[in-house]
């Protein structure tokens, strides 16, 4: 997932789940990428879809 355009102050409510390496489901790429930034890049995609 390319997170180069993040973090963003607000994400849409689009539902395209991403499962992170922390076993948490993020509602979409924007929310996932904002979490990646907060984790200093340690968070990765486990798979697309719910965890």
Swiss-Prot record:
Single Gene Ontology MF annotation: serine-type endopeptidase inhibitor activity
Residues covered by the Kazal-like domain: 1-49
Glycosylation site residues: 40
UniProt keyword terms in alphabetical order: Disulfide bond, Glycoprotein, Protease inhibitor, Repeat, Secreted, Serine protease inhibitor
CDD domains per the UniProt record, alphabetical: KAZAL_FS
Intrachain disulfide bonds: 3-33, 11-30, 19-51
Main localization (coarse): secreted
Presence of keyword Disulfide bond: yes
Name of this protein: Ovomucoid
Species name: Polyplectron napoleonis
């Amino acid at each position: 997932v390319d997170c180069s355009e993040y973090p963003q102050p607000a994400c849409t409510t689009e539902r395209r789940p991403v499962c992170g390496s922390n076993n948490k489901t993020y509602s979409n790429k924007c929310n996932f990428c904002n979490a990646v930034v907060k984790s200093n890049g340690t968070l990765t995609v486990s798979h697309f879809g719910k965890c």
